[in-house]
Amino acid sequence: TTINHNYWLLMLDSNLYSDVHGVGAPKVNGLLSQTTLQWIDNIFQLAQKKNKRIIPVIHHNTVTHYQALEANYTLDNADELRDILFKYGTPFTLSGHIHAQHYATIESANHKLMTDIVTGAFASYPSYISKISFTDNAITYQAEPLAMTDNAITNSIINPQLRDYSNYMKHLFDDSSHKMVYGEMIEGGWYQENDPLLEEVAQYVAALNLAFFAGKPINILDLQDIPNIEKIQQLIDDNATTFFKDYLKMILDNQTDYTELRNIHW
């Protein structure tokens, strides 16, 4: 698809489909066939002849963003796709699947860099859209929340959920996080009915979970309304699964804001 005089958009379907419709769970991992890879190479050859730059868009990640999420999230044959992208000097891809605002960069054997940018899922708080500006030799990327409330007011939409969209979506997100945390407690055998500290654990994890999906570092202000932080962390350390603890540590260690303006040059 032509974006402007200089750029083409290349939409790639990496999903795997069942021959038996509606039976069993869908496949989560993704793969590009050898036929598709050859077609991609041909498209890049054509673009090169016409002096066009290509922006590839794909569901599965072309670079691993988190080691714990490599299986089923990074394209099964991402290395083969990256070989083509490095060959033609493509510096970035747009992908999704992990639902979290993030970017990850990989370096080729001859020191070329390629960045995979994931825009957070529009269906979950804070409902990001990506804004991309183009020049002849660079793009500027930034993620920002959709201004749904402004649109609802401008168009006289009276639906209360749309007029207070941010708070509505945050409530849904927090509710989902609470269910995840209580599931961890119950499955791990450390849920105790009527223990008030467990609700604080759920609030604490919900705040961290929000920071992860929003692509922002956790700020002390995000936790200021949660008392007993040390007790909460100790309870988690003593009882939660290794995966759960590692997930929270990864969020606490992050110092990068993945929504900030990012410039990528050819």
Task: Set out the residue ranges of the language-model regions.
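Short acidic, gly/pro-rich beta-turn/loop elements at beta-sheet edges
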Residues: V20-G22, Y66, P126, Q142, ...
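His/acidic metal-ligating clusters that form di-metal
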Residues: W8-M11, V23-T115
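Acidic/histidine-rich helix-loop elements
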Residues: S18-L32, D150-D164
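Acidic/polar loop patches that form or flank catalytic/metal-binding clefts of enzymes
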Residues: T93, T140-Q142
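Non-catalytic terminal accessory segments
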Residues: I153-W266
